[in-house]
């Protein structure tokens, strides 16, 4: 059953001679080498000042409540309502102890609803975003650089450096060379062997990043032989994780005993994952192969070159793992290096058929961000079919406000994750950023969401930042890649934000969000006088439309880059009008 709202007046957008009417609002990098600039605003219905506006027509989505607990809907959101111009009400299917850090996440950034209606259908918003943030995009020269200019109408503190330029290289040595030569002002993820050179150079500064991440080896449990739990468990016992961390990770990194880092509340409840036990691994592998009627395993080790805090040297670590699988377990592998965007899309679609190297960096410090996204009911096809017992335990943890109940739920969930082995948990990697010493305000965020507007690049008018890869798009409602999220965060803002360089959720486009006594409803009061970079006024309908475009899989603005919108079901439990399961 579809849930479609009545149409508010301001979402009728004229494009040429045709009137396109949208109910409410619902990433590939640009393919050419031509610079992409901010689109003209003439195609967007002009906004009017609040004092001159017609009576405000707040909208609700969906018009009737979402069918909480009724298949096929598995989501946790019941309804979003613009009760007036500056108030939005979120009705939930069950309490959500992580509501505030969720709505602070940049994936849930707010867009001008008229702009979405005009530019989502043709996907032009992927490369030319509008937002309320401290910067606007002035140019995207595909394959080379992404340029930002300070937003002259920004409601908050103006950017200290007028321009920011993003560049990228997947080679740590190249990033360091650019920093040392002075062609860039800051870099992400210096190589483990380069940190000493940075800290020993008075002209540079290293900022350490807390290891709120996890590196893992994943399997699709619907594909043989990974459908056999004994084989998955044998690989978990047959990998020497200590050797990997010691040889390839920077100081401060840890062997991971749990999928969620221990500095996240409730992260390390229950039993630690399997340790290195070669004899037990060989015995289990033999049993599993006998059950499958096979005598050997040959597969691909699938990965991308993108450096991350959880994976500091992908080719070297992949080579090490391939060697261990061969030497320890007799599993022969072929290294399969894939393009980053295609790799992530294949992971989301559940089409990676080998052992894949991936990881996760925290978006907010709660187990729901790590566990629900990967193993919950709305986690999708990344690891094949979700395990119902794991999903049930996670549902309890995600919907209880009682700490003892949450703790017990995560004990159960972690024990079941250990037993089922959807992935081999390997490492929590330390990482950091490095800047020229004269860049004031430089920092490394534990969430990898560095805020460039608070940095002053000496006496220069442009701060040049070099990260690991090019963004996939600048509409992050349909992205999961950290390089894309960081790029979006300079332009788009969410209802809440995170403190600079930290993890605490603080007011953003909302001055406050307050829960009802039973925590079934959150009421958010919006900041008045905020405008988007296209000149449109920010109001409550923009919030409803921005969320609806992600929430409803049948929404006309549910477009994005790949169309996967992975974060929504991973963090909110499921889509409204979900697509049928893949055959």
Model-flagged regions — what are they?
Residues 44-57, 83, 89-91, 175-178, ...:
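Aromatic- and charge-enriched surface segment that lines or borders ligand/interaction sites
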Residues 49, 63-81, 245-246, 327, ...:
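Extracytoplasmic/peripheral linker and loop segments enriched in polar/acidic and small residues
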Residues 128-132, 466-517:
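N-terminal lobe/hinge region of extracytoplasmic solute-binding protein
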Residues 48-113, 525, 556-583:
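Surface-exposed binding/hinge segments that line
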Residues 286-362, 465-468:
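Ligand/substrate-recognition segments at binding pockets and active sites
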Residues 254-288, 305-316, 452:
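Structural transition elements
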Residues 105, 123, 151-197, 527, ...:
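Ligand-site clamp/hinge motif
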Residues 433-463:
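Long beta-strand-rich cores associated with HINT superfamily self-processing modules
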């Amino acid at each position: 059953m579809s849930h479609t709202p009545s149409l508010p007046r301001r979402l009728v957008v004229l494009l040429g001679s045709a009137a396109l009417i949208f109910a409410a609002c619902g990433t590939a990098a640009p393919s050419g080498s031509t610079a992409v600039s901010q689109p003209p605003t003439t195609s967007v219905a002009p906004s009017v000042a609040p004092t001159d506006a017609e009576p405000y027509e707040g909208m609700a989505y969906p018009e009737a409540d979402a069918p909480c607990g009724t298949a096929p809907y598995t989501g946790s959101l019941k309804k979003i309502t613009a009760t007036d111009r500056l108030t939005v009400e979120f009705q939930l299917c069950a309490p959500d102890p992580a509501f505030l850090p969720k709505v602070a996440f940049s994936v849930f950034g707010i867009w001008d609803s008229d702009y979405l209606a005009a530019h989502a259908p043709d996907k032009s918003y992927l490369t030319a975003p509008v937002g309320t943030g401290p910067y606007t995009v002035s140019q995207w020269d595909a394959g080379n650089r992404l340029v930002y200019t300070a937003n002259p109408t920004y409601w908050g503190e103006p950017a200290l450096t007028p321009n920011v330029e993003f560049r990228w290289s997947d080679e740590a040595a190249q990033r360091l060379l650019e920093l040392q030569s002075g062609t860039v002002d800051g870099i992400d993820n210096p190589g483990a062997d380069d940190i000493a050179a940075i800290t020993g150079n008075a002209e540079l500064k290293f900022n350490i990043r807390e290891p709120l991440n996890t590196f893992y080896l994943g399997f699709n449990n619907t594909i043989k032989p990974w459908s056999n739990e004994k084989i998955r468990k044998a690989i978990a016992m047959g990998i020497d994780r200590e050797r990997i961390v010691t040889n390839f990770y920077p100081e401060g990194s840890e062997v991971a005993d749990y999928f969620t880092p221990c500095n996240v509340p409730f992260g390390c409840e229950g039993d630690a994952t399997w340790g290195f036990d070669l004899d037990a691994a060989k015995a289990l592998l033999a049993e599993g192969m006998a059950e499958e009627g096979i005598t050997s395993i040959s597969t691909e080790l699938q990965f991308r070159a993108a450096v991350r805090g959880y994976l500091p040297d992908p080719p070297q670590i992949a080579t090490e793992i391939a060697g261990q699988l061969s030497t320890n377990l007799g599993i022969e592998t072929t290294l399969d290096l894939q393009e980053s965007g295609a790799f992530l899309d294949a992971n989301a679609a559940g089409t990676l058929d080998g052992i894949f190297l991936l990881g996760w960096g925290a978006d907010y410090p709660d187990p729901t961000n790590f566990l629900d996204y990967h193993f919950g009911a709305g986690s999708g096809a990344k690891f094949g079919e979700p395990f119902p017992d794991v999903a049930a335990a996670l549902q309890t943890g995600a919907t209880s406000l009682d700490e003892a109940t949450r703790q017990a739920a995560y004990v159960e969930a972690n024990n079941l994750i250990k037993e089922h082995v959807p992935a081999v948990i390997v490492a929590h990697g330390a990482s950091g950023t490095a800047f020229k010493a004269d860049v004031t305000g430089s920092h490394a965020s534990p969430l990898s969401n560095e805020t460039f507007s608070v940095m002053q690049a000496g006496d220069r008018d442009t701060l040049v930042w070099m990260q690991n890869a090019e963004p996939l798009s600048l509409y992050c409602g349909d992205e999961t890649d950290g390089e894309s999220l960081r790029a979006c965060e300079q332009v788009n803002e969410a209802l809440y934000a995170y403190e600079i360089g930290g993890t605490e959720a603080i007011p953003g486009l909302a001055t406050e969000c307050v829960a009802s006594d039973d925590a079934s409803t959150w009421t958010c009061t919006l900041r008045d006088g905020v405008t988007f970079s296209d000149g449109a006024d920010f109001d409550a309908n923009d919030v409803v439309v921005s969320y609806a475009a992600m929430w409803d899989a049948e929404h006309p603005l549910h477009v994005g880059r790949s169309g996967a919108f992975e974060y929504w079901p991973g963090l909110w439990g499921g889509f409204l009008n979900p697509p049928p399961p893949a055959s």
